[in-house]
């Protein structure tokens, strides 16, 4: 296929992917036109010549003219296929449409069920609704071709594939029906992988270039000439291979292999040395300086990040232990295509979990006594921070451990679903963390993985409480990974929120979420947040820095303090805690907050500090009476310590925007501590602003019930003496 050396360059392949991304056509739609539509005249059975292929590409890419060199290279790539030779016999200048379909589908998304059904019909040449032995053999030939394309070791693959195909024939009829095909492909046999239609199996070998302006003198890995200080070149995210812009087209393929493609590569990881990139300036073998200013010199290992002299290479053994970050890394030797195992090993595990029940493209067997890290990154969080963090983690870890959340958390969780003792790192804001936690909840893991947070953007209340800081500001990610190793597991209570609207015809905004991880509030703070939210949606360019956001928030808070839109809130809200009415008659409130963690609004501690006696927080709270469902006694509330794991909520009254500002700046210690409870019900009589975990909305009169849902394991960062928990500019 297009991977054949000398036929299509990596640059042409990248351009082809862009063409496909911009096109609205699907390869299956175009194939139907050639199969029984107006383009059928170009077909010779399952084969097609160059003129027909050219028309196919124009229609598929929606282009009047496809670059001739690209179209020609693609055609001859397919033409050299072993499968094409088998199918077309003596037809010298034709290619197989089934090859074209499979490999272009590799670059597309789509529902697995649709792909399976269409592929069945593609190989059911006599259209009788079953796959007979001849058609099954053609499928096996195609699978062998895909395996060769992906550089797998195919020496023992054919008998494994034949056994898989026999097992699909569940009724023993000697043929495979559509139902058997779809059932096997959706549950046990990785058919989409074997037929080249699973995008998770995109092959290695392509550099992932990004432009970089170098702040130090470096040398091009191809021509070995310098790239001057302050000049721009290209750096590969995966291997740190550096080139001039004009040298990129001639660069050797990327040597990083993210998974084992042969049985002999499984279990033992070897060093992968790349010339240059020795930024520490000192050899890890002999401890002498590596003089990098005169030429391209030194070697660095992609996996353990050792830096050595060229002359020290012989003194370093071939086996790589992945270095200081071995606890987090899934080395390529731990990941291999599931089809490469034979016999009973290749039979996949069954599970009751339908959300993640798909046949695994890979088997993962991590190094013993390690805790592989699954990294989720929200590229929309924190401006351009997300993209920078993605690039860094793709180099520090195996790129297959790092997932952009544009496709949601499911692909990453599915990839790791059978990995023992893995951890998760979520790079994003509180909303991103909540999204990942909700997806984990639906995945029904037998053992739920603990979650750490790398906070991006503003707010980040949960990250503050878990000691991961107020927001990422370019710190060394290796230091953060070492902190994860030193972290401890704590359990975060999660609460279910049910909104029951009154039947009075008034409309409300959609409720952002039914799950509370951090806090819920009604009144003044939600009003400020709602105005902030509307303005940011209308003018996003005015909210592109942490400082600007704080100034806007200050402006809205000042306006709210003047107009007091939620004055006398107690007259329009009643509060029941565990069935007992909470008396608010002696208070004049503009807001009520229900806290699961002691940080809100980007660093405010509305509950306030409590002088802690020596001892465990849970034991202290029980001694003070928190074992009871309700605590409303003011004297006991003064000594209650917030605990995100105690299955209790703290209820706080807020007098107004001025009091909120005083608490934020530490001029006032806390709001009014009203209660500590395990269930709470609000009844409102007018439309009021509300918010869940910083997401505001306007809610018409309703009843709101909050009950405990479950607990999720989180990772608490190690203590830091310099950590400022509730500083004003945090």
UniProtKB/Swiss-Prot annotation:
It comes from the Eukaryota. Its EC number is 2.7.1.107, 2.7.1.93. CDD domains: C1_DGKalpha_rpt2, EFh. Coiled coil: none annotated. Stimulated by calcium and phosphatidylserine. Residues 368-501 form the DAGKc domain. Residues 111-146, 156-191 form the EF-hand domain. It is found in: Cytoplasm, Cytosol. A zinc finger (Phorbol-ester/DAG-type) spans 206-254, 270-320. The modification N6-acetyllysine is found at residue 479. Keywords: Acetylation, ATP-binding, Calcium, Cytoplasm, Kinase, Lipid metabolism, Metal-binding, Nucleotide-binding, Repeat, Transferase, Zinc, Zinc-finger. It catalyses: a 1,2-diacyl-sn-glycerol + ATP = a 1,2-diacyl-sn-glycero-3-phosphate + ADP + H(+); a 1-O-alkyl-sn-glycerol + ATP = a 1-O-alkyl-sn-glycero-3-phosphate + ADP + H(+); 1-O-alkyl-2-acyl-sn-glycerol + ATP = 1-O-alkyl-2-acyl-sn-glycero-3-phosphate + ADP + H(+); 1,2-dihexadecanoyl-sn-glycerol + ATP = 1,2-dihexadecanoyl-sn-glycero-3-phosphate + ADP + H(+). SMART domains: C1 (SM00109), DAGKa (SM00045), DAGKc (SM00046), EFh (SM00054). GO terms for biological process: diacylglycerol metabolic process; lipid phosphorylation; phosphatidic acid biosynthetic process; phospholipase C-activating G protein-coupled receptor signaling pathway. Ca(2+) 2 binds at residues 169, 171, 173, 175, 180. GO terms for cellular component: cytosol; plasma membrane. Pathway: Lipid metabolism; glycerolipid metabolism. GO terms for molecular function: alkylglycerol kinase activity; ATP binding; ATP-dependent diacylglycerol kinase activity; calcium ion binding; phospholipid binding; zinc ion binding. Ca(2+) 1 binds at residues 124, 126, 128, 135. Gene3D superfamilies: 2.60.200.40, 3.30.60.20, Diacylglycerol kinase alpha, EF-hand, Probable inorganic polyphosphate/atp-NAD kinase, domain 1. Belongs to the eukaryotic diacylglycerol kinase family. Diacylglycerol kinase that converts diacylglycerol/DAG into phosphatidic acid/phosphatidate/PA and regulates the respective levels of these two bioactive lipids. Thereby, acts as a central switch between the signaling pathways activated by these second messengers with different cellular targets and opposite effects in numerous biological processes. Also plays an important role in the biosynthesis of complex lipids. Can also phosphorylate 1-alkyl-2-acylglycerol in vitro as efficiently as diacylglycerol provided it contains an arachidonoyl group. Monomer. PANTHER family: DIACYLGLYCEROL KINASE, DIACYLGLYCEROL KINASE ALPHA. This is Diacylglycerol kinase alpha. It comes from Mus musculus (Mouse). The lineage of its organism: Eukaryota, Metazoa, Chordata, Craniata, Vertebrata.
